[in-house]
Structure formats: structure tokens, C-alpha cells
Amino acid sequence: MGFFSEFKEFAMKGNVVDLAVGVIIGAAFGKIVSSFIEDVITPLLLKPALDAANLSTIEQLTAFGGVKYGLFLSAVINFIIVAFVLFLIIKAMNHAKKKDVAPPPPPAGPTQEELLTQIRDLLKNK
């Protein structure tokens, strides 16, 4: 088997394709969360604090002349939201998996032959 055919076989496996789709969706989701933080959360929740500090964005928060802790705070908020949403997605998937799994069948009772044998033995003992 040639190098390229092996690579093609590897690349077309379900797990690799699923992983690639997950990475692409994750990157797009990261952009959505970043926009949510910068365009919704920061203006709504942090607006009073930013106005008091005479700043327009959280990224402008600095300390000691150059430490940009505003960018760090933005990244932390971003991470917390992404982690929480992923937790909710995984929790929903696990809940759906539990519904899909059929309960184990009840233990099988005695077969017809075993019942007949028991009846025969009971009749013999009388």
C-alpha cells in the first residue's frame, strides 16, 4: 500500500473527519463567544466601571503603565462562558445517550422444559 493511499485511508476514517469538523465548529464558536463578551457583556455589565475609569473598552485597563489586565479579564470571562456552554452541551448529550440505551432485559425465567420437570418432580413426590 502506497504512502498516499495509507494517508487517504487515515484521513477518511470517521474519527479524523469528526475531529476536523469539531475543531472548525469550535473555532467559529470561539468567535461567537468573543463577540458576545466584547459586544454584549462588557457594554452591559462593565459599562459603569469603565465609565468611572474613563475607559471605553475592557482592553484599555492597564496597571503600572503597561500590564494589560483588561485583556486578561476578557480572556478569563471568555473561557468561563465557553467552558460553561460546553458543559451544558456535554450534559445534554449524556442525557440523550441515557435515553437511547435500552434497559437490560429482565432475567429470563425458567424454560418450558424446566417448568415441566419441576411439575413432574412435584407430582412424583406426592
UniProtKB/Swiss-Prot annotation:
Signal peptide: none
Full protein name: Large-conductance mechanosensitive channel
Domain of life: Bacteria
GO cellular component assignments: plasma membrane
Gene Ontology molecular function terms on file: mechanosensitive monoatomic ion channel activity
Location relative to the cell: Cell inner membrane
Described purpose of this protein according to its UniProt entry: Channel that opens in response to stretch forces in the membrane lipid bilayer. May participate in the regulation of osmotic pressure changes within the cell.
Organism, as annotated: Flavobacterium johnsoniae (strain ATCC 17061 / DSM 2064 / JCM 8514 / BCRC 14874 / CCUG 350202 / NBRC 14942 / NCIMB 11054 / UW101) (Cytophaga johnsonae)
Membrane topology: Multi-pass membrane protein
Keyword Acetylation: no
Keywords from the UniProt entry: Cell inner membrane, Cell membrane, Ion channel, Ion transport, Membrane, Transmembrane, Transmembrane helix, Transport
Gene3D superfamilies for this protein: Large-conductance mechanosensitive channel, MscL, domain 1
Pfam family, one: MscL
Residues passing through the membrane, by range: 17-37, 70-90
Subunit structure: Homopentamer.
Similarity comment text for this entry: Belongs to the MscL family.
